[in-house]
Amino acid sequence: ERYPSLTVMQVNAASLRRRPMRHPCLVAPRSDDYVLDLPDSEDAWLASLSAQTREKIRYHWRRAQRRQPSLRFRTFAAASIDDAQLRAVIGFNRARMQAKGRRFGMDDEDQRRLCALMRERGQLSVIEIDGVVRAGLLCTLAGDDIAMHVIAHDPAFDDLRLGFLCCVMTVQDAIAQGRQRFHFLWGHYDYKTRLGGKPVALTQLLLLRARRHALRHPWRLTTLGLAALRGWLRSLRQRAGAARH
């Protein structure tokens, strides 16, 4: 067999149609990826949204342009992305988390890896005001798919909904490029479903070469077991909430 020293493989987030059959595996619910299947045209996408959402997009875009006439939307491909732009958007995200009293989810190493990934296969979308980045999306490209990793805006412009508008414009840009799917990724936020995202269950997977190899990785087994328990409890809460409504 190839790679005989490899006894275990862990995948933290995957969409599985069926369990792998060749090797023993353990699975646990991970989260949901909100996926938007992109139509052939911007008009078709807008028509698929609710009338309220379409009006909300028009209202906030016109209001932002009226308040900030220099506002413009731009995209940058991997080779033209500047680290200062990436740090600005990540900084906006950090400020938002801190303002909410929540822990920022990326340490310095996470940020370095994300910046390296952006330079390799990323697309940066920004809204600028007077030539300064005030909102942005950090996305990666894979085939016909585009995935959003970070969305953030300058807290000084909270009232203009720049993050939401930048996301809308990025979806429209993806349609113009001929992309097939837009992945909002995990985390339930109202705007993802308003813009057409549908939840797709993601699974955490531990794949073993043989059952006996499970004994070599007790920590991985414990972590996955706890993840499965959390997923089960979450599904119970969701069913209870649905029953109340």
Predicted regions and their residues:
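Residue-identity detector for threonine
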Residues: 7, 53, 75, 125, ...
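Acyl-donor binding region in acyl/amide transferases
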Residues: 1-30, 143-200
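A conserved beta-strand-loop-helix scaffold within acyl/acetyltransferase catalytic domains
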Residues: 11-36, 40-159
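Intrinsically disordered, low-complexity, positively biased terminal segments
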Residues: 1-20, 97, 101, 231-245
